[in-house]
Amino acid sequence: MVNQVATDRFIQDLERVAQVRSEMSVCLNKLAETINKAELAGDSSSGKLSLERDIEDITIASKNLQQGVFRLLVLGDMKRGKSTFLNALIGENLLPSDVNPCTAVLTVLRYGPEKKVTIHFNDGKSPQQLDFQNFKYKYTIDPAEAKKLEQEKKQAFPDVDYAVVEYPLTLLQKGIEIVDSPGLNDTEARNELSLGYVNNCHAILFVMRASQPCTLGERRYLENYIKGRGLTVFFLVNAWDQVRESLIDPDDVEELQASENRLRQVFNANLAEYCTVEGQNIYDERVFELSSIQALRRRLKNPQADLDGTGFPKFMDSLNTFLTRERAIAELRQVRTLARLACNHTREAVARRIPLLEQDVNELKKRIDSVEPEFNKLTGIRDEFQKEIINTRDTQARTISESFRSYVLNLGNTFENDFLRYQPELNLFDFLSSGKREAFNAALQKAFEQYITDKSAAWTLTAEKDINAAFKELSRSASQYGASYNQITDQITEKLTGKDVKVHTTTTAEEDNSPGWAKWAMGLLSLSKGNLAGFALAGAGFDWKNILLNYFTVIGIGGIITAVTGILLGPIGFALLGLGVGFLQADQARRELVKTAKKELVKHLPQVAHEQSQVVYNAVKECFDSYEREVSKRINDDIVSRKSELDNLVKQKQTREINRESEFNRLKNLQEDVIAQLQKIEAAYSNLLAYYS
């Protein structure tokens, strides 16, 4: 049963990562407690070392590790077998997967000791708990009804935000959280919700169907929301077993092979560009041919069943490698970096404090006064970096908002060619028939919305790349400013103690000696549970992609569509009516439609460009403002802590007699305790690396 090994290995590796997370979380918590206890003891001895920032950061990191999960977002159009796939993955017939029903709400599947479903609403109502049968009955709809709702731009359950399904399953218990999206469509509310998860998941499982290879809707979604955004996507071609069933002679091996190869060529042609990382082709590690129904049937009969021939073993191996090796190692490396910083800060503070215990108050004040110029230099570095961020902010906000303005104003230049692919099938008699005119108008409105959505997505991708490039440049500047900052803090230590103190002994060749604020600014530290997917600096504690999302869902996709489509329908209708009942040339009718649409569109583009470019400006500005606020706060905290560390010692010397020997021992014990916790974290990380090597 060799292929069962993939499932077992996945569970075992998840368990191993969960154990390491737990070990590191405990060590971080003890590290925070150790430093905090020492700070409290400092009040009755030589004074606090002002390590509040380290205590706060490692406490947050410890909590994040405790709550750590790998979040998988399942995307796919209706009737692609998403629920069947998920049931096969978890090994239970949990989610509705009958022939007809479609899950109609976004569902978050996570571990819970008891089986329960909680519905969360968006209108202020309190969450509602349901049993599974009622959930399946109430929140699944027929595909025909789903299609009708989509055409009418309506949601099946407009008051529902999402559902949380808790279930005592091994896969979930070991740290997997699954988000099941209702389907691919262009409703703004749905996309806003789904895109929020797209930006905050570890991997996307994009479910397709062998019998419907790469539909227009799927290609549009990938082009608009996935392409070029640094996301990790696993493409799951479901119902591969039905390729054989579609043949006239299912036993014809040659015909089956030819049919499968044709399908593979189609999928490769459409998906290859999404399976390249830094120039390397990883198509075989990202695209999988699955037979979910076969896997589910086997696992329901025997959870340990051999899944050979279903495609699941290969998929599980790739997902396992990505999550428990690539992503887990990256996450835990940041934790190790944070622990090293806390250890170094403690050792630096102890190394400064011990020599100063020997000095009387006057000598101590004299030495503190002597380093005032250096502290002014630290403030100068802060001001210079802050100025660079603000200049970058202003340049990017102006440039990107202007690019949006130009982009919108130029839509009319290419509209006639661009709109052809969106134009609905034009039956003039349908339009002239009052009974069918509403359906025609709805189809036309949907065509405009798709056109505007695609155009907006294309521009947004360009804007994101520009912003990302700007943050990369700021990251390089942070490294340079950090190096200068370190030189000055070393000078402060030398002038205070009279010694050249080397304290960066826990830093290896793979890391630089940048101060904590610079590491944060460079994206080397993450204290945020969001922004898990893609882009350099995605690990940074601020979340610029979600800032953009929050603004851009308010913007012109909604604003442009509202401004344009509602106004266009009237003039277009008059133009078509003017052709007369006897006019049967559909081609000319189409040309008239596009011509009139362009004429009306161009009328409104200046207003849209003017109004929405300000929204774009504000969005980009807020991205850099949030970054600047956090960077400035962290630099200020560092400068203030260094000053207060010295002021605390002066205050204590002025008010009490300090027992130098006991204080020396206390500080040395603190240093040893901190190093001991760091060593445990280093060992846990190294052991995990050794296991995977």
Swiss-Prot record:
Residues annotated for GTP binding in this entry: 79-84, 235-241, 292-293
Stretches the record annotates as GED: 607-693
Keyword GTP-binding: yes
Sorted UniProt keywords: Cell inner membrane, Cell membrane, Coiled coil, GTP-binding, Hydrolase, Lipid-binding, Membrane, Nucleotide-binding
Signal peptide per UniProt: none
Segments of this protein annotated with the region G3 motif: 180-183
Region annotation G2 motif: where it falls in the sequence: 102-103
Membrane topology, as annotated: Peripheral membrane protein
Catalytic activity: GTP + H2O = GDP + phosphate + H(+)
Annotated ranges, domain Dynamin-type G: 66-313
Region spans: G4 motif: 238-241
Documented effect of changing K82A: 15-fold reduction of GTP hydrolysis
GO cellular component: plasma membrane
Keyword tRNA processing attached: no
Region of interest called Middle domain, as start-end residue ranges on this chain: 311-571
Segments of this protein annotated with the region G1 motif: 76-83
Subcellular location(s) per record: Cell inner membrane
Annotated function: Dynamin-related GTPase probably involved in membrane remodeling. Lipid and nucleotide-binding are thought to induce a large intramolecular rearrangement, leading to assembly on lipid bilayers and possible membrane curving. In the presence of the non-hydrolyzable GTP analog GMP-PNP self-assembles on a lipid bilayer; this does not stimulate subsequent GTPase activity. Does not bind lipids in the presence of GDP; perhaps GTP hydrolysis disrupts membrane-binding.
Domain remarks in the Swiss-Prot or TrEMBL record: The GTPase domain dimerizes and forms the BDLP tube surface, the middle and GED domains are elongated and involved in self-assembly, while the paddle region inserts into the outer leaflet of the membrane, possibly promoting membrane curvature.
Subunit comment: Homodimer. Self-assembles in the presence of GMP-PNP and liposomes, and probably also in the presence of GTP.
UniProt record similarity statement: Belongs to the TRAFAC class dynamin-like GTPase superfamily. Dynamin/Fzo/YdjA family. Mitofusin subfamily.
Protein name from the UniProt record: Bacterial dynamin-like protein
Organism: Nostoc punctiforme (strain ATCC 29133 / PCC 73102)
